[in-house]
């Protein structure tokens, strides 16, 4: 292995090590004040069938995501089966539990490997660059949907959640993104545009530039596949169903704590658990949105980041003690982690045998 390749490997290793260390720090900050005897007692007395329902909602979201992605892939390669796309989604999510963001690239490889050959027989119809472009478009839709739901909730429920959003999200965001940062961002955008134009102008001068141009072109074809779908309304329905499942995942976990026997807990702890269990559907929607923000933190599987952000929101908005908020965060996160592990392992076996 050359020194250059070793340097790249070392940089990636450091990147993932820092990511894992950040997750450990956030987990420590989240659980350092937890009284483990009461924490375990609270988990034991919850209604586990509601937790299973949350896991099933998670699996349903994987399936709807696969069907939505299949619609984006159809203009590129209509022969890709729903099973293959579902397996790709599951394997990607499984990979993200260990290596953040890497799963998005892995699932593209699964699709390409199973794609039919092109007319010239030199590559697959769903080449890697085109599939990656569909993932870029899919994730862009997720961000737009999240922003739309967040704005709707803030407009209709500002009196309840506005203080938390302003103090914990808007002010830190505004403090980090001053004028200099926006100029830097604009400069990077212009640099990217200039780079693309340069590659296009010089595409016939060397094989390397020609290959790079081909990759960028394929990536763009994947992005614009969204506008070539015959049934765009189905894409929107699947998007709505995905976020409906996310909301159900949050609401069912709240239901799992409703009416539980808290006699084994201390008076203060049991009172806080009871307040937590009384939260309704709109609160579940807010917690879903807050939990989604944890994906911005580059840690494996959202470990630590999800727990800390959600417990902080429960403490700030509802006055629920942080250690009690951790119970909800743990049930929410770990139930979905188990669902991802089971589906990911099953899909990996399925792809290995195909």
Regions found by a protein language model. Give the residues of each.
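Transmembrane alpha-helix boundary/hinge residues in polytopic small-molecule transporters
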Residues: 67-68, 106, 248, 305, ...
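Membrane-interface alpha-helices at helix entry/exit sites of multi-pass transporters
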Residues: 82-87, 104-105, 117-139, 143, ...
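Predominantly cytoplasmic-facing regulatory/coupling regions of multi-pass membrane proteins
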Residues: 1-90, 156, 161-292, 328, ...
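Transmembrane alpha-helix interface/packing and boundary motifs in multi-pass membrane proteins
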Residues: 57, 91-100, 286-307
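Alpha-helical transmembrane segments and their lipid-water interface positions
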Residues: 57, 65, 69, 96-107, ...
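Transmembrane helical bundles of ABC transporters
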Residues: 67, 71, 82, 90, ...
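Interfacial segments of multi-pass membrane proteins
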Residues: 111-118, 222, 286, 308-324
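Helix-loop junctions at the membrane interface of multi-pass solute transporters
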Residues: 74-76, 97, 108-123, 313-315
